[in-house]
């Protein structure tokens, strides 16, 4: 499926080396302030062109809003956004046809679609397609801002270098003023060096990010199927290269006794609250009004400039690949922005399901 969501619903399209990637967004109520600058800002956060190793293709992210927005406000009709592919070089992939790259989706796509799949730049499986997700996420973030919800993430590990100190949500947000969104300057310097080193060696690295959603109202999610954690996990694993997810205090909770893991319930600002929020803002699959936080881990970019063993599917014999095209030394920074977007899309969908935002009336007619 290329469609995600029930009430706030996105359908993405396009391949890495096609004319464009894009998204159609259904479910946005009329009257939401939305400008091209809102979309542009999120797409630019994903670029990282100032670090050449992270985005050698460096698409200019020229886009058009084709429908659903007039005079700076949504119309309550489908919003279509197209992002043009300007800097694809398909000749890099000529010698890779029918020779699936280890670690990429090439083999899976061949087994599912036969010779009809587009292998150039990874085709539909490319990280390039997440630009469309980020554009949709910009709309979701704007909708969530009407409810006071703020979604932001940061890098916690890259190439084996970890952030080990504690931090606040404000530090997470301000880290975006740095070359990479990393709260710890010492870790940031080491991460930049490992990126440089692996680029020089023709290799790649993976890593981890943490997502925060603050101001999330209680009551989002369902008691069984449709749990908010389950749907956020599905959203996360929709992004290429994701390999693991850790919620709240995560694996540390599994090592505790129940008396340690349980969060005391207290009164804060006149309402029930959790004392430490080790569970990441969700109990029984439903939000409780505390910040949501979780970590997601990404594998290294499969494209590397080192010999890799594969098979020639046309001849059904062993082959060796040595990729000569452009590649990102790590998917982590760009994927972080896509993960923020999928988080916002999921929360917007649940806000609509819960009736916190109504689709059948303009936003200027408040329901909360």
Curated annotation (Swiss-Prot):
<dbReference type="GO" id="GO:0010181">
    <property type="term" value="F:FMN binding"/>
</dbReference>
<dbReference type="GO" id="GO:0004107">
    <property type="term" value="F:chorismate synthase activity"/>
</dbReference>
<comment type="pathway">
    <text>Metabolic intermediate biosynthesis; chorismate biosynthesis; chorismate from D-erythrose 4-phosphate and phosphoenolpyruvate: step 7/7.</text>
</comment>
<dbReference type="GO" id="GO:0009423">
    <property type="term" value="P:chorismate biosynthetic process"/>
</dbReference>
<dbReference type="Pfam" id="PF01264">
    <property type="entry name" value="Chorismate_synt"/>
</dbReference>
<feature type="binding site">
    <location>
        <position position="326"/>
    </location>
    <ligand>
        <name>FMN</name>
    </ligand>
</feature>
<comment type="function">
    <text>This reaction introduces a second double bond into the aromatic ring system.</text>
</comment>
<dbReference type="InterPro" id="IPR020541">
    <property type="entry name" value="Chorismate_synthase_CS"/>
</dbReference>
<keyword id="KW-0288">FMN</keyword>
<dbReference type="InterPro" id="IPR035904">
    <property type="entry name" value="Chorismate_synth_AroC_sf"/>
</dbReference>
<dbReference type="GO" id="GO:0005829">
    <property type="term" value="C:cytosol"/>
</dbReference>
<dbReference type="GO" id="GO:0009073">
    <property type="term" value="P:aromatic amino acid family biosynthetic process"/>
</dbReference>
<feature type="binding site">
    <location>
        <position position="46"/>
    </location>
    <ligand>
        <name>NADP(+)</name>
    </ligand>
</feature>
<comment type="similarity">
    <text>Belongs to the chorismate synthase family.</text>
</comment>
<dbReference type="GO" id="GO:0008652">
    <property type="term" value="P:amino acid biosynthetic process"/>
</dbReference>
<feature type="binding site">
    <location>
        <begin position="124"/>
        <end position="126"/>
    </location>
    <ligand>
        <name>FMN</name>
    </ligand>
</feature>
<dbReference type="InterPro" id="IPR000453">
    <property type="entry name" value="Chorismate_synth"/>
</dbReference>
<keyword id="KW-0028">Amino-acid biosynthesis</keyword>
<feature type="binding site">
    <location>
        <begin position="299"/>
        <end position="303"/>
    </location>
    <ligand>
        <name>FMN</name>
    </ligand>
</feature>
<keyword id="KW-0057">Aromatic amino acid biosynthesis</keyword>
<keyword id="KW-0285">Flavoprotein</keyword>
<feature type="binding site">
    <location>
        <position position="284"/>
    </location>
    <ligand>
        <name>FMN</name>
    </ligand>
</feature>
<protein>
    <recommendedName>
        <fullName>Chorismate synthase</fullName>
        <ecNumber>4.2.3.5</ecNumber>
    </recommendedName>
</protein>
<keyword id="KW-0274">FAD</keyword>
<keyword id="KW-0521">NADP</keyword>
<keyword id="KW-0456">Lyase</keyword>
């Amino acid at each position: 499926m290329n469609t995600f969501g029930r009430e706030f619903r996105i359908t993405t399209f396009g391949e890495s080396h096609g004319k464009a990637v894009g998204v159609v967004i259904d479910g946005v109520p009329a009257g939401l302030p939305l400008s091209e600058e809102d979309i542009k800002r999120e797409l630019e956060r994903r670029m990282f062109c100032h670090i050449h190793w992270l985005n050698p293709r460096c698409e200019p992210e020229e886009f058009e809003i084709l429908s659903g927005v007039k005079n700076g406000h949504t119309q309550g009709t489908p919003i279509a956004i197209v992002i043009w592919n300007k800097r694809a070089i398909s000749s890099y992939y000529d010698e890779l046809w029918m020779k699936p790259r280890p670690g990429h989706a090439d083999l899976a796509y061949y087994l599912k679609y036969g010779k009809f799949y587009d292998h150039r730049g990874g085709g539909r499986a490319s990280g390039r397609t997440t630009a469309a997700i980020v554009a949709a996420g910009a709309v979701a973030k704007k909708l969530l801002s009407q409810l006071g919800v703020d979604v932001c993430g940061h890098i916690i590990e890259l190439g084996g270098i970890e952030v080990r100190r504690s931090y606040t949500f404000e530090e997470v947000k301000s880290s975006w003023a740095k070359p990479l969104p990393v709260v710890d300057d010492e870790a940031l310097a080491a991460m930049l060096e490992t990126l440089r080193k692996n680029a020089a060696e023709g290799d790649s690295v993976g890593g981890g990010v943490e997502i925060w959603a603050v101001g999330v109202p209680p009551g989002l999610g369902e008691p069984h199927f449709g749990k908010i954690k389950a749907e956020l996990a599905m959203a996360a694993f929709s992004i290429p290269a994701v390999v693991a997810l850790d919620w709240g205090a995560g694996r540390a909770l599994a090592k505790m006794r129940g008396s340690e893991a349980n969060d005391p319930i207290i009164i804060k600002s006149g309402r029930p609250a959790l004392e430490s929020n080790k569970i990441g803002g969700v109990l029984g699959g439903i939000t409780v009004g505390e910040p949501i936080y979780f970590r997601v881990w990404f594998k290294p970019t499969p494209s590397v400039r080192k010999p890799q063993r594969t098979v020639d599917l046309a001849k059904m014999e062993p082959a060796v690949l040595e990729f000569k095209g452009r590649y990102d030394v790590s998917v982590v920074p760009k994927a972080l922005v896509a993960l923020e977007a999928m988080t916002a899309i999921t929360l917007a969908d649940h806000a609509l399901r819960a009736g916190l935002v109504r689709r059948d009336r303009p936003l200027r007619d408040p329901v909360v």
